């Protein structure tokens, strides 16, 4: 058994992600699907956060639950398919959610601040950079930021983007250089097989590196109230790993779970971080929404992983429509291994794919860039 204190002794900045199922578990109707906020749970979390702050820890909370609470309050049947209804529910539920958080923390003399984000926010470089400053300022003033996705105004299908805020919490943790992301849900951690089906399923206490085998353990979502299954939590761990941030997945039903985790108790699954931390710009590129895909050959992949630029000779195919300056995925043999900011449009790349640099001008009539993607504009997603 691994000594958790070996990894968690120097933890100072913590992001706590709380899933919908945890927030509403004890306050459901007879169907077990239509649920409202469990105030006792929120009060317990606030009390634990207060204790962590007394120990000098900085804490940010990422809270799901707005849509579910809104549906309950409006008397709407669970899981409506219509986006406008879900957005309306989110608007109602978010205000109620914040009221509970504010009241719970006020009992400990702590103020809270609401921050609502969308994925598009991360694709804008200026907004992305400003997030760090905003959160840092709130922490300096002793405020606990409460973050959620802006479900009411997001232009994409709700919950298809962040995965019940698993990805959102990881992106926040990555951006603010958090030391630890704690994901609380209704599951005990990562198992080598589905524990609801297999009695011999084994809880994996420590993940040193996220391998394809580890990813295969993700399976399908396990919680019927949230949308964030284990697969999205593993993806969240991958995002945090490249930023040097640990991830701990634990069951929210454990009494004083946050305090026990930080005291080194063997709870849930701990994902370690990469030793090589991606630079801030590379992290932004990786976290940005891709406008398309550039498929490359094995030689080009090796060159990119070796911290070299992508040349047109290594381009095999192009998918999607994108312009110069857009973020695109780099794919080889069906696997995305990097993202980058392209210097050529998809239309141009279709014409020059496979061509050597000195042939570009003859094909296009001009040669504005010798590289398809400069090395400083690439974020590596696998080593």
Curated annotation (Swiss-Prot):
SUPFAM superfamilies given in the database record: Carbamate kinase-like, PUA domain-like
Signal peptide: none
Biological pathway: Amino-acid biosynthesis; L-proline biosynthesis; L-glutamate 5-semialdehyde from L-glutamate: step 1/2
Enzyme Commission identifier(s): 2.7.2.11
Binding positions for ATP per the UniProt entry: 17, 185-186
UniProt entry tagged with the keyword Methyltransferase: no
Binding site residues for substrate: 64, 151, 165
Superkingdom, natural source: Archaea
PROSITE patterns given in the database record: GLUTAMATE_5_KINASE (PS00902), PUA (PS50890)
Main location: cytoplasm
Residue ranges of every copy of the PUA domain listed in the record: 291-367
Pfam families attached to this UniProt entry: AA_kinase (PF00696), PUA (PF01472)
A GO CC term attached to the entry: cytosol
Keywords attached to this entry: Amino-acid biosynthesis, ATP-binding, Cytoplasm, Kinase, Nucleotide-binding, Proline biosynthesis, Transferase
Name this polypeptide is given: Glutamate 5-kinase
The species this protein was found in: Methanosarcina barkeri (strain Fusaro / DSM 804)
């Amino acid at each position: 058994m691994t000594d958790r204190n070996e990894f968690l002794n120097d933890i100072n900045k913590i992001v706590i992600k709380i899933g919908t199922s945890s927030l509403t578990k004890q306050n459901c109707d007879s169907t077990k699907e239509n649920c409202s906020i469990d105030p006792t749970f929120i009060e317990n979390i606030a009390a634990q956060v207060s204790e962590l702050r007394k120990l000098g820890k900085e804490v940010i909370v990422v809270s799901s639950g707005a849509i579910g609470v809104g549906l309950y309050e409006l008397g709407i049947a669970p899981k409506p398919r219509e986006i406008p209804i879900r957005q309306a529910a989110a608007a109602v539920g978010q205000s109620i959610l914040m009221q509970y958080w504010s009241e719970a923390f006020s009992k400990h003399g702590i103020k809270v601040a609401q921050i609502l984000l969308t994925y598009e926010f991360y694709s804008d470089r200026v907004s992305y950079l400003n997030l760090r400053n905003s959160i840092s300022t709130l922490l300096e003033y002793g405020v606990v930021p409460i973050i959620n996705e802006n479900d009411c105004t997001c232009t994409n299908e709700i919950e298809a983007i962040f995965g019940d805020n698993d990805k959102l919490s990881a992106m926040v943790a990555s951006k603010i250089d958090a030391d630890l992301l704690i994901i609380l849900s209704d599951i005990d951690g990562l198992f080598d097989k589905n524990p609801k089906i297999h009695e011999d399923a084994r809880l994996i206490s420590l993940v040193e590196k996220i391998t394809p085998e580890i990813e295969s353990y993700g399976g399908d979502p396990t919680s019927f109230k949230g949308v964030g299954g284990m697969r999205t939590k593993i993806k969240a761990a991958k995002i945090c790993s490249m930023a040097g941030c640990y991830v701990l997945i634990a069951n929210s039903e454990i009494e004083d779970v946050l305090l026990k985790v930080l005291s080194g108790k063997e709870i849930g699954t701990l994902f370690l971080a990469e030793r090589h931390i991606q630079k801030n710009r590379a992290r932004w590129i990786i976290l940005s929404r891709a406008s398309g895909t550039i498929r490359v050959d094995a030689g080009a992949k090796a060159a990119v992983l070796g911290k070299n630029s992508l040349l047109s000779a290594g381009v095999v195919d192009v998918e999607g429509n994108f312009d110069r300056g857009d973020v695109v995925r780099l794919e080889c043999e069906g696997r995305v291994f990097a993202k980058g900011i392209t210097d050529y449009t998809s239309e141009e790349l279709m014409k020059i794919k496979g061509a050597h640099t000195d042939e570009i001008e003859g094909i296009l009539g001009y040669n504005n860039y010798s590289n398809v993607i400069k090395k400083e504009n690439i974020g590596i997603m696998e080593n």
